[in-house]
Amino acid sequence: MVSATSVRNGAGFMPCQGLYHTPAGTNPKVAFIATHYNVDFSEHYLAPYLAERGYGYLGWNTRFRGNEAFLVLEHALVDIAAGVRWLYESAGVEQVVIVGNSGGGSLMGAYQSQATEPNIAATRGLRLPEAVFDLPSCDYYVSLNAHAGRPDVLTAWFDPAITDETDPASTDWSLSMFNPENGPPYSPEFVDRYRTAQFARNERLTDWCIGELARLDAAGMSDRAFNMYRTWADLRLLDGTLDPSDRPVGVCYAGDPRRANYSPRGIGLTSTCRSWLSMWSLRESHCRGEPHLRRIDVPSLVVQSTSDTGVFPSDAHAIHDALGSHDKSLEFMAGDHYLTEPDGARDEVADRISGWLDGYGI
């Protein structure tokens, strides 16, 4: 499907695409939509479970699917709007439920926030498209194992011990979570020093991107790409006393945290200066959840798995507390991040969501 700010390219690539899951032979009046910054959500794991319960489910992708290095938030929101409009205008849906899942939580929160009360500013050096002021709003909001925001999760996972952003092996071992002399368990003093240094790393990268854009502009260039290393270093991965939950300790989404941290596999590995400012910068990005959640005033449900190794109880509480809706609830349930365990976890979460909607007579 085309978007208000992009059309099909010469190779046939459509900016927006997805799969609409429905019960056989029916046209549901209530449908869900889920989108991620980068991950292909067209076959999202919740889709068949909620279709079995009588709902439509649009697993939707923007032009940045698999290509977050070039993400610009305002255009991602316009692409999501194409999916929401399709549900209302073509699929015959009367009410739409947003699903903010995993890293897509802050993206969908930003969408509903902008649809409710236009607020985002243009990415540095760009202009906002007119279409971003005409986003159809949705009727309900579900947050499921959602990160608090793209800049927030990156900073929480940052390894602040890296001393040279161009050298993934460079390390200040006095600040490394993998130095046994520091823990685990980690002392309150080390935790404070570590988190301050994580914030400082984000700020340094923001300053570098801003300065680099100015340097490139003077040279007649618009942007550049760069790599960012060492992003599997949240202290909570090795210290279960921090933000305690039922999660296994010593495990991250990519397996062993130390091995993952020193591998090229990590969130935000490649960005341009401009996309980094749009998505990852604490100072500049509009991909932080809390400011957007304040504007969401529709009925809202927050569900969090207790064995999640990347989203923690404090994240779920922060999301719930930030939501502007007076009609909101927070539920914890057994399960890992993707609800692959225990058996029946996906059925359970689908039942919880369906039961919550039943309370509104839909």
For the regions a protein language model found, what residue spans apply to each?
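Short beta-strand/loop motif that positions the catalytic acidic residue
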Residues: 296, 302-304
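Alpha/beta-hydrolase
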Residues: 172-291
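N-terminal cap/lid segment of alpha/beta-hydrolase-fold proteins
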Residues: 1-30, 342-343
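Short, surface-exposed "cap/lid" segments of acyl-processing enzymes
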Residues: 22-66
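Conserved alpha/beta-hydrolase "acid-adjacent" motif
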Residues: 152-153, 285, 309-315
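Primarily recognizes the serine-hydrolase "nucleophile elbow" in alpha/beta-hydrolase
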Residues: 86-89, 94-166
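Catalytic histidine-centered segment of alpha/beta-hydrolase-like enzymes
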Residues: 335-348
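Catalytic nucleophile-loop/oxyanion-hole region of alpha/beta-hydrolase
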Residues: 63-97, 345-349
